[in-house]
Structure formats: structure tokens, C-alpha cells
Amino acid sequence: MRAVLTRVKSASVTIDGEVVGKIGKGFLILLGVGPNDTEKECRYLAEKALGLRIFEDENGKMNLGLDAIDGEVLVVSQFTLYGNCRKGRRPSFTDAAGPELGNALYEKFLAICEELGYPPQHGEFGADMQVESINDGPVTLILDTEQLMNEPRRS
């Protein structure tokens, strides 16, 4: 499972001209699901993302989490995070999960966010969406469970 997490001052997602999700200060999470992902990766990624302390404290140091700033979360499904650009000029998306698994784990991710105390605003799986954000910093992180869950911890 992959996420591109951006610290934002605000963000919104629009479908067919209607804003369906909107947040103030918090995290915009673009979420991609791989074909071998399970609920285990989903829970790990949600807990990791929502626990990050990437907001500045009074000393300007990245030390505060969502809870400390009363932050919000906007989650948007993004199968193109599994785009493969190795051959040719047009990306292949065969490395992404199929729609059934992708939607199931996207919905599970949303449920876990809520369970963790951050009811997310969100887009619609498979829809054509327009996403607007005012990035803060900018601070953008790429989280990939294949790397995070399998690499030995550095001391």
C-alpha cells in the first residue's frame, strides 16, 4: 500500500462540480492499493500516517501531530501511485490492485482513520476527481508499506 501524505493548510476534493470533501489544516492523503495488500498493511499505514509529528511547535521544529493541532484528514484514492513508467512513454497500471480489492481496502482505511479518532473527509473510489490543496511547507512524504514493514530499523 502506498500513500503520498502532504501537510496542508486546506484541501478539498470535487466530483462533478460538487465539493464532496473539504478540510482545514491537516493531512491530504493520496492512497494507492497494491495487489498483495491486506488489512494488515491498511492498518499499519493508517496508524503510521496519522501518528506522524510533522507540524511545527513553538520553536519551529516538526514535533506536533494531528491531535496537537486539531488537524483534519482528507483521503483520496489514487491507483496511479502504482504506475510503472519503465517502458515507453505511457505508464502501465497493472501493478495496482483490481477495483474490488482496491475499493475494499480504501473503505477499510477510511474506517480505521475514524476508529483512530480522525473521521476522514474523502473522495469516491474510481471517480474522476479534482483535488485542490494549499500545501504547508511544503511537507510531503511517501509512505510505502512494502518498504516500511520489511526494512530493518536503523539505529
Which ranges hold each PLM region?
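Short, charged, intrinsically disordered terminal tails
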Residues: 144-155
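RNA/tRNA-interacting regions in translation and RNA-turnover enzymes
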Residues: 11
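Divalent-metal-activated hydrolytic enzyme cores
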Residues: 114-129, 134
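C-terminal edge-of-domain segments
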Residues: 131-144
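Residue-level signal for inorganic ion chemistry
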Residues: 45, 76, 139
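Compact, glycine-rich, soluble single-domain proteins
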Residues: 18-70, 80-111, 115-116, 121
